[in-house]
Amino acid sequence: MHIAIAGNIGAGKTTLTRLLAKRYGWTPHYEPVDNNPYLEDYYGDMERWSFNLQIYFLNKRFRDVVAIAKSEETVIQDRTIFEDARIFAPNLHDMGLMSDRDFANYTDLFDLMMSLVKLPDLLIYIRSSIPHLIEHIQRRGRDYEQTIRIDYLRGLGERYEEWIKTYQGPMIIVDGDKNDFLDNPADLQRITEMIDERLYGLFPLDNKD
């Protein structure tokens, strides 16, 4: 089974992936950040490195999806291949940071890949406001993220909302501003109840009965 977590930069995808993997005994697949050879250069010069970075992510994510499809384990994935192609690449193109030629090439490659894979069994989308994202980004202190532009985050957020409206697979939406799933066990419990209901048809026990 394939569970995927989606959300803007700083939404808490990696944290929720780790917590749910531990809670359910699922196998986590994390976003390839630490060993990414393009990420630091990209945040220093987005226009120069946007295509290289997006192709790198697309390659890694496609390999992940193929491996997940072959696995007998339940895998929870930190970010999806759809976010790369439906959110990040179009946002860069609209901002003038990816050329028409590169964007067309990238989109053709993604469409070919999508003819070979299926949607996750469940998508968990973390919806977060820009101030909340900025707070998380500053708190985790990755040097290359400190130069992220607010208009870049805002553009991503708008594209996420457009994508979610048209997403065709099973999905739950988590309010990232109101659910502190890292430090508040009750918030994490509420999320797991949503997952149980969607995946297994289970409903939370009513403690008043």
Show where each model-derived region lies:
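Hydrophobic anchor at the beta1->P-loop junction of P-loop NTPases
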Residues: 5
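Conserved lysine of the Walker
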Residues: 13
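Conserved substrate/cofactor phosphate-moiety recognition/catalytic segment
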Residues: 22-60
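A basic- and aromatic-enriched beta-loop-alpha substructure that forms the phosphate/nucleotide-
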Residues: 61-101
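A glycine- and Lys/Arg-enriched "phosphate-lid" helix/loop adjacent to the NTP-binding pocket
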Residues: 86-159
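NTP-dependent small-molecule kinase module
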Residues: 134-209
